[in-house]
């Protein structure tokens, strides 16, 4: 039995829900009417059973699908029993019944009481709120901030999951509130006492938590965000590099300029309000005077040929703007410290793989993580990652999840840098968070199950956000 719909708009709405899930599939809705009820005239699905095309051609008789192909039905004992239309009353073309096609319809449309569950649209708040009272609510990412996140690569890992939805929205979790409290702590507290590392199981939501921290900072008038995402690009030997005799470190000029460019574009409206404290000579014939706005200053630094010097000068001037007489703060975000803790794919002149500490930019990041370099006011927020999967023995020892092997060497830079970092462990979804996410997925037509199945999916996934999403969308 197919479900009975009271209006043409109702049937179209529900067929759209299914066609969205069955990529490549199509439902054609007839306009025939009997007793105020609409029925399917032709349905074509071609995802679940790619070897065949399943078609049903029927007439509106109480919502049933009828077929005149009795022989085909007898050849397939697995096919569901379908009522026969007497030849004298058939007013449609001869139909073909393909095995299991009704099973697909029954599974999608006819489960339980032969009706699709009507779920009210999940409430998505258009304006982000950062108080603890917002926990358990879905918030839409404003378009302006979404473009900034895309601009510095924060959404690379999320593109697949976000592609399911018409707009990008995030669940305000308990960890979200914790991170906001971290960023809002004492106005005079610098990064020396504000170094935090998010750790957790694969799929626990570390990158999403970092994004929410960045969204908060970007929405505030007194935060400069320094985003370091897609850290694999700093170690996979895909960019130019060279040895700097003065620094005694390897330098990646193109990547450094790319980082400075993303900082400039992300914070342009705030940088133009800040001024340089000192004059700087970039070239022999060019001197940038004190009092130059940081946006213009950074633009000239990017155009210069000395990338390491440009980065050093900019960070120095940015720190000058976070002194006690200013309300400006800095948020340094490092997504995937794991990949920065293992040997890179770059090689030296002797064809040996280079450790990350031998690179100027990576070495600089670990100085901020360790607290040997600081901003007067701000936060350093990093996260471990399981993508790509690499063995991180030194990082595991630093995090206390592995014991030091006296017969194997460890990276002392990693161990020292994380010695006094505050570890924030990612927790699984609570039951309330699972239900809220399930409501959002169902109302967005991404999940075909009933909302009440959130308990089952919570158990199957162990509350792991990524596994929960996969469990809810397994029919999609």
From Swiss-Prot:
Pfam families on file: DAP3
Keywords: ATP-binding, Mitochondrion, Nucleotide-binding, Ribonucleoprotein, Ribosomal protein, Transit peptide
Principal location listed in the UniProt entry: mitochondrion
Transit peptide start-stop: 1-54
GO CC list: mitochondrial small ribosomal subunit; mitochondrion
Disordered, as annotated region: 58-97
Protein residues bound to ATP: 200-207
Protein name, as recorded: Small ribosomal subunit protein mS29
Provenance organism: Schizosaccharomyces pombe (strain 972 / ATCC 24843) (Fission yeast)
């Amino acid at each position: 039995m197919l479900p009975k719909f009271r209006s043409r708009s109702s049937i179209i709405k529900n067929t759209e829900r299914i066609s969205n899930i069955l990529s490549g599939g199509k439902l054609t809705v007839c306009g025939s009417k009997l007793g105020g009820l609409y029925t399917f005239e032709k349905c074509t699905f071609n995802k679940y059973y790619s070897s065949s095309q399943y078609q049903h051609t029927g007439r509106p008789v109480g919502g049933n699908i009828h077929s005149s192909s009795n022989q085909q039905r007898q050849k397939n004992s697995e096919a569901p029993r379908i009522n026969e239309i007497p030849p004298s009353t058939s007013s449609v073309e001869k139909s073909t019944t393909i095995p299991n096609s009704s099973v697909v319809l029954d599974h999608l449309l006819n489960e339980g009481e032969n009706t699709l569950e009507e779920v009210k649209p999940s409430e998505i708040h258009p304006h982000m709120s950062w108080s603890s009272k917002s926990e358990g609510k879905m918030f839409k990412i404003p378009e302006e901030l979404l473009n900034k996140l895309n601009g510095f690569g924060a959404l690379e890992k999320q593109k697949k999951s976000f592609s399911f939805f018409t707009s990008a929205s995030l669940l305000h979790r308990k960890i979200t509130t914790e991170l906001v409290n971290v960023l809002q702590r004492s106005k005079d507290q610098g990064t020396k006492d504000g170094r935090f590392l998010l750790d957790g199981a694969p799929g626990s939501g570390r990158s999403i938590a970092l994004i929410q921290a960045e969204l908060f900072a970007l929405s505030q008038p007194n935060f400069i965000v320094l985003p370091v995402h897609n850290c694999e690009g700093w170690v996979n030997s895909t960019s130019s590099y060279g040895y700097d005799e003065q620094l005694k470190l390897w330098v990646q000029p193109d990547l450094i300029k790319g980082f400075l460019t993303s900082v400039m574009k992300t914070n342009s409206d705030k940088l133009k309000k800040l001024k340089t404290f000192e004059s700087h000579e970039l070239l022999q014939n060019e001197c940038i005077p004190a009092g130059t706005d940081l946006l213009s200053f950074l633009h000239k630094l990017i155009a210069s040929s000395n990338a390491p010097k440009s980065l050093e000068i900019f960070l120095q001037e940015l720190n000058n703007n976070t002194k006690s007489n200013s309300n400006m703060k800095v948020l340094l975000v490092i997504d995937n410290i794991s990949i920065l803790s293992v040997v890179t794919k770059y090689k030296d002149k002797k064809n040996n793989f280079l450790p990350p500490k031998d690179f100027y930019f990576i070495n600089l990041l670990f100085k901020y993580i360790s607290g040997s370099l600081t901003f007067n006011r701000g936060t350093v927020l990093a996260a471990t990652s399981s993508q790509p999967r690499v063995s991180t023995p030194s990082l595991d020892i630093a995090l206390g999840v592995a014991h030091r092997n006296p017969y194997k060497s460890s990276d002392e830079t990693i161990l020292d840098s994380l010695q006094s970092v505050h570890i924030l462990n990612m927790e699984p979804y609570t039951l309330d968070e699972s239900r809220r996410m399930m409501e959002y997925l169902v109302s967005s037509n991404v999940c075909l199950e009933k909302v009440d199945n959130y308990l089952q999916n919570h158990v199957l996934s162990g509350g792991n956000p990524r596994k929960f999403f996969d469990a809810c969308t397994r029919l999609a």
